[in-house]
Amino acid sequence: MAVNVNTNVSAMTAQRYLTSATNAQQSSMERLSSGYKINSAKDDAAGLQISNRLNVQSRGLGVAVRNANDGISMAQTAEGAMKETTNILQRMRDLSLQSANGSNSKADRVAIQEEITALNDELNRVAETTSFGGNKLLNGTFATKSFQIGADNGEAVMLNIKDMRSDNALMGGKTYQAANGKDKNWGVEAGKTDLTITLKDKREGDVTISINAKEGDDIEELATYINGQTDMIKASVDEEGKLQLFTDNNRIDGAATFGGALAGELGIGAAQDVTVDTLDVTTVGGAQESVAIVDAALKYVDSHRAELGAFQNRFNHAINNLDNINENVNASKSRIKDTDFAKETTALTKAQILSQASSSVLAQAKQAPNSALALLG
């Protein structure tokens, strides 16, 4: 082996391995201290891109869960207020039935009407003041809003909260008053027993109801017979013996038309719009009509409460799914980006040993040219 002074190949080789070991040691220390095996694009360019996309998705899923929880909270707030609306309407119905009883005097009914009016004011106050995050929920201004429950655009769900004010048309219906009252001595005449009611059901379309009363039926029996034949229209009789008919705006679209001999004899009038806001229980007829109006309002409120309950259940399932997706996304990201401490500590130990060995060899290699001095000696 030649003895060289100008070029120390052994030292150069030792220096190269020392540099490599030092770089490996620094890389291992960076991975262990940060907890990530990918700290820059040079570590793994493809892995960095994939892990960043997964991180974006994970953060989006986290926001979606928060959005869904906000949606549940909003629906719970609205539904909770609507529960009180239901309680108010039930009390109104009780009072209407009480007022319809013959044992009450005019003064009694006026007193009952005062409570009806107070309850109506409270129902509207609930509708006007129920809010969530500054958004009024029940006064008709909320309309429809979207809730982003996904990590990407286009993954929104619409929520509609309806108007719960007492003057809302869907909190009532249409009433029809007969012009001709009938006393207890009146009875359905032979050949004049037919009554036809034509209306448009929102679910079934145009419907014609044929009522064939029995000869001799009085006005109360006629009302009972009508109620027994269909649930699309409610019949009652006021204190003057006049037939009253009511259709629910939630089910019937537009006004009903009446035909047949009985329609002409009774003189059934044109439709009048009525809502909870117009309840008047100061008469027997008004009290009877109020029961039908409140029943329609209760159906409307309860139906929307059911919709909000379904919305909450849907969002609960959405949150469960989002949490599951987020868990799997983070597991994938962890496998790509996170440091395997067992593996990396082994690599660090190896790099430290090689670094120390290379340093020792380099020190010895630097002494090799000194042997040339012995030859000159």
UniProtKB/Swiss-Prot annotation:
| Record keywords | Bacterial flagellum, Coiled coil, Secreted
Q: Which GO terms describe its molecular function?
A: structural molecule activity
What is one GO cellular-component annotation here? Answer: bacterial-type flagellum
Name residues in a coiled coil.
103-129, 301-340
Q: What is its main location?
A: secreted
Where in or outside the cell it occurs: the entry states: Secreted; Bacterial flagellum
TM annotation in the entry: none
Q: Which NCBIfam families match?
A: PRK08869.1-1, PRK08869.1-3
**UniProt similarity note:** Belongs to the bacterial flagellin family.
Function, in words: Flagellin is the subunit protein which polymerizes to form the filaments of bacterial flagella. FlaC is not essential for flagellar synthesis and motility.
What other facts are recorded?
V.cholerae is able to differentially regulate the flagellins within the flagellum maybe to produce flagella which are particularly suited for motility within a given environment.
Subunit details: Heteromer of multiple flagellin subunits including FlaA, FlaB, FlaC, FlaD and FlaE.
Protein's UniProt name: Flagellin C
Q: Which gene encodes it?
A: flaC
